[in-house]
Amino acid sequence: MRLVESFLSIQGEGKYAGRLAFFFRFAGCNLRCAGFGGERISPKTGAILRGCDTIRAVFTNHFEHEEILNLSQLLNKIPNLSGSSCFAPACSAPGFCAAESFFESDTLNSAAAQTPFCQKDNGENSLNLTSENSLNFAAQNSLNLDPQSAAASQSAKLYQKPIIVITGGEPMLHHKEALFYEFVCELLARGHAVHFETNGTILVDFEKFPAYKSCVFAVSPKLSNSAEPRERRLNFAALRSLRQNAKDSFYKFVISPEFDAQPEISEILAACESEVYCMPRGADRRELESGAQFCVDFCLKNGYNYSDRLHIRIWGEKDGV
């Protein structure tokens, strides 16, 4: 499992636009989307790579990415915004959740002995969450914290935890991998909202991996202007499963005057209804601005929600934002 980048920013698109967010972009995608017109020169071969706006995450053999070998590599990247080492109450160790002391406590160990869905992982100070019920365990037992921990918990209410946005590429390619799933479970146990950005082609096994039921899915089904074959870009069974099982899900589509998206969006909605957010195409501020009015008119005509692309409006083409 390889990580392209991680960074603190705001969510720039969709239903949760404007929210404080920490992004993890994982390498790997099952689509190329050459029709989107993005181009980048391979630093290894000099070849011109064509695809979407995240070419580094798609053409993985052409770029150097960080190999993720353990959970702490990921958790250590989440920044300190609260004056402590992480977002859990009473943190005590740099970069690792200070709720470790709680995870090591007799309270947890005795509960784990009685609770089949709450199991201690031998390799990391974390919980192996195998049921939705376990996601509430730490929150319920945090009521028994000592006075110092309780004070830290009270001060934690003064700031917002960032949502954790897991993106790619296509992050759900990794959803069955043990380390990836443990990462999601740990984030949820710490009280983070976990959001996935996905193309909706991967059928997620919500029964075997129930923690995903507590996550939000921003789904961007690819239309014919992606230049991907229909059988590769649309998986209606996967879309229906996301809609039925996820904590929340919604569609995002990029709209431009050159392509009539409405017939294809209607087809997707007929197969699986969900909220729709439409965004103007825009690789830079100028293109975004020029397409905004058309996109707004498209939304008004068809009854969809408009979404800006705040990261492009603020930072332009800059990576890592």
Predicted features by range, described:
Residues 23, 165, 252:
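Short aromatic/hydrophobic contact patches that present stacked aromatics
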Residues 16, 63-65, 229-231:
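Short, solvent-exposed loop/turn segments at secondary-structure boundaries
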Residues 1, 35-123, 128-130, 136-213:
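Conserved Radical SAM active-site core
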Residues 159-162, 172-321:
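Conserved AdoMet/S-adenosylmethionine-binding subsite of the radical SAM
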Residues 1-51:
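N-terminal pre-triad scaffold of radical SAM enzymes
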